[in-house]
């Protein structure tokens, strides 16, 4: 299953400038927030979570909240995702991969999910 999302970095920057950490707290854990360097990172994380929920075919919903999708980085600073135990079981997920890029004022993410 594959999901994709694109977001204007300026849109995320505008929301962040108005709401600061209140905005971040709506979709990122404190651990995920620790990775943030700038608003482009926030936009990339938004796109990752949206793409992951689309790959599941449900979007952000009761079946999969923002906090059921967990972003972490490896020692080379590359992003990875995993899902909550609830989502892993409900959707029979074996593994997930993510790619994120920034260009021309946009952040785009693609998530591929392999089922058992």
Curated annotation (Swiss-Prot):
Cofactor(s) annotated in UniProt: Mg(2+)
Alphabetized InterPro entries for the sequence: 4-PPantetheinyl_Trfase_dom (IPR008278), 4-PPantetheinyl_Trfase_dom_sf (IPR037143), ACPS (IPR002582), Ppantetheine-prot_Trfase_dom (IPR004568)
Pfam families noted in UniProt: ACPS
Residues the entry annotates as binding Mg(2+): 5, 50
Domain of life: Bacteria
Catalysis performed (reactions): apo-[ACP] + CoA = holo-[ACP] + adenosine 3',5'-bisphosphate + H(+)
Protein's GO biological process: fatty acid biosynthetic process
GO molecular function, one term: magnesium ion binding
Main location: cytoplasm
Cellular location(s): Cytoplasm
Family: Belongs to the P-Pant transferase superfamily. AcpS family.
Protein name: Holo-[acyl-carrier-protein] synthase
Function: Transfers the 4'-phosphopantetheine moiety from coenzyme A to a Ser of acyl-carrier-protein.
Gene: acpS
Record EC number: 2.7.8.7
Organism: Campylobacter lari (strain RM2100 / D67 / ATCC BAA-1060)
Keyword set, alphabetical order: Cytoplasm, Fatty acid biosynthesis, Fatty acid metabolism, Lipid biosynthesis, Lipid metabolism, Magnesium, Metal-binding, Transferase
GO cellular component: cytoplasm
């Amino acid at each position: 299953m594959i999901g994709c999302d694109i977001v204007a970095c300026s849109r995320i920057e505008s929301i962040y400038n108005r709401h600061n950490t209140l905005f971040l707290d709506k979709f990122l854990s404190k651990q995920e927030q620790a990775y943030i360097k700038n608003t482009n990172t926030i936009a990339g994380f938004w796109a990752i979570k949206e793409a992951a929920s689309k790959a599941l075919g449900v979007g952000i919903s009761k079946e999969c909240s923002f906090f059921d999708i967990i972003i972490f980085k490896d020692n080379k600073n590359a992003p990875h995702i995993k899902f909550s135990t609830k989502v892993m079981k409900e959707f029979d997920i074996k593994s997930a991969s993510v790619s994120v890029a920034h260009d021309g004022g946009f952040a785009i993410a693609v998530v591929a999910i392999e089922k058992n």
